[in-house]
């Protein structure tokens, strides 16, 4: 299954706020799930919607998400928590959380077009897994700086998560540590996502 490129507002009306996908929001929170449903939602439907929420927020293909779930399942600790850590430490998501891009798809374009450096070297892989003490910056070129500055100017002034530090004047961010569960930028029940895939096998 390919990465979603359809109407974004349609997705947030069905699944709720997806800040990584789009900065747009419905006029009121009550409209998020106000669409009529045919009867009570099944447990399968609930797990499916939670999985879709995770996939669309982080901009993943189905195959990519399955791979992350498998990696998380082999790691020590809670599979759901490890899964969120893996997704949150992706380079495209780090750029988004720093405010250097207004959305994760926008961050992915910055990386693909070679505007982003990690520890002084160009990295053009959006899924690159960032580590503590990594320094994320833009190329020392006017176009790269303008793209990031436009995003920082338009970004909502949300508090920066504790695992990141931003020096906006230098177009530079630092990964301080691995993110903890409190710093995740999406309201999600990750256990339902793990349950969804465990029942598919």
From Swiss-Prot:
Any GO molecular function = structural constituent of ribosome
Q: What is its main location?
A: plastid
HAMAP family per UniProt: Ribosomal_uS4_B
Q: Which Pfam families match?
A: Ribosomal_S4, S4
Give Gene Ontology CC terms: chloroplast; small ribosomal subunit
**Listed name of the protein:** Small ribosomal subunit protein uS4c
Q: Which UniProt keywords apply?
A: Chloroplast, Plastid, Ribonucleoprotein, Ribosomal protein, RNA-binding, rRNA-binding
Determine the domain of life of the protein's source.
Eukaryota
GO term, biological process aspect, one: translation
Sequence segments annotated as region (Disordered): 1-43
